[in-house]
């Protein structure tokens, strides 16, 4: 770590180390002038020799400073100390959503359905705000959601987010397939940038995991997991857990349709259905089988997928170039 407890970044005193990723270190700090506790995100300046990483940092800073919503972690300040840039974020007293999921599962055997619905509504509200402001998160997962002791959720970590109209970043030998395999939309796996519907897909995967206790597609390795998103349909939640309402199952699986045009076009529509489950008629939802994405199920067909994968909790990015022989995985 570049900083120790007691170090100062301008008026901010480092209190503790919160984490270290592939791209930045995160610290708990205190504003010596106001006494306010904050989070300092300090990117490794050596990485800025790569123009792509520098642009990604600038983009995250721009995104974070533009946000003002109770369901999204806020940026408070930013600066540069001895040629090292840093971002000051709202300190959220609590933990990440993954830890809360484990705790509730240990207590109740499964996350209560009313909690599943509440979390879904909170996350949908945050995404609705982000999308209305031209921001696509592109890496929504429990590790990137903060949870307070009072049950409030805040979406965080915009290292892979996309601003509407932002210039496409090009990574050497890589496409824009960015995300985490368990939650990546099929179009992201295929190297597309993704749009609001990619976030809706990830929201659906999270909702499925909340209700079922497991993600819908989990292979022996992350290549097999991604192949599942491209070729398989999730088992109905009502088969995984008998107390899941059929209406909730329909909403979640519509959000997770393989092809973007088959999903909700707006997260606001998914939120509305979630808030009015008693009015949702599952028989009106088209949840039938979908063809594999791009015909990838053909046993003799091999396709090259070059992806950018962030698969370690707390890491901003992990760059991986791969060639997947899908016929071996299916």
Predicted segments — roles?
Residues 82-96, 100:
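Conserved short submotifs of the Hanks-type protein kinase catalytic core
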Residues 44-66:
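AlphaC helix of the eukaryotic protein kinase fold
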């Amino acid at each position: 770590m570049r900083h120790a407890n007691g170090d100062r970044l301008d008026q901010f005193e480092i209190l503790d180390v919160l984490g270290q990723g592939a791209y930045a270190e995160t610290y708990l700090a205190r504003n010596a002038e106001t006494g306010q506790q904050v989070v300092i995100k300090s990117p490794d300046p050596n990485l800025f020799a790569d123009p792509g990483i520098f642009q990604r940092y600038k983009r995250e800073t721009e995104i974070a400073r533009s946000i003002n919503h109770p369901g999204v972690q806020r940026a408070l300040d930013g600066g540069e100390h001895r040629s090292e840039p840093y971002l000051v974020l709202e300190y959220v007293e609590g933990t990440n959503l993954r830890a809360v999921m484990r705790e509730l599962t240990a207590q109740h055997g499964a996350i209560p359905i009313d909690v599943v619905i509440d979390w879904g509504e909170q996350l949908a509200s945050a995404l609705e705000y982000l999308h209305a402001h031209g921001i696509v998160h592109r890496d929504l997962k429990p590790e990137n959601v903060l949870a307070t002791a009072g049950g409030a959720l805040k979406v965080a970590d915009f290292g892979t987010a996309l601003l509407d109209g932002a210039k496409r970043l090009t990574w050497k030998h890589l496409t824009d397939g960015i995300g985490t395999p368990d939650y990546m939309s099929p179009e992201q796996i295929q190297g597309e940038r993704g749009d609001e519907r990619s976030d809706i897909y990830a929201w659906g995967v999270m909702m499925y995991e909340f209700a079922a206790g497991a993600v819908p597609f989990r292979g022996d390795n992350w290549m097999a997991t991604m192949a599942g998103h491209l070729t398989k349909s999730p088992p109905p939640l009502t088969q995984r857990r008998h107390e899941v309402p059929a209406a909730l199952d329909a909403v979640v699986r519509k959000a997770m349709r393989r092809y973007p045009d088959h999903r909700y076009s707006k997260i606001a529509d998914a939120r509305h259905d979630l808030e009015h489950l008693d009015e949702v008629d599952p028989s009106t939802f088209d949840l039938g089988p979908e063809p594999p994405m791009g015909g990838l199920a053909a046993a003799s067909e091999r396709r090259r997928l070059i992806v950018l994968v962030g698969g370690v909790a707390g890491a901003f990015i992990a760059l991986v170039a791969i060639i997947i022989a899908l016929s071996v995985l299916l």
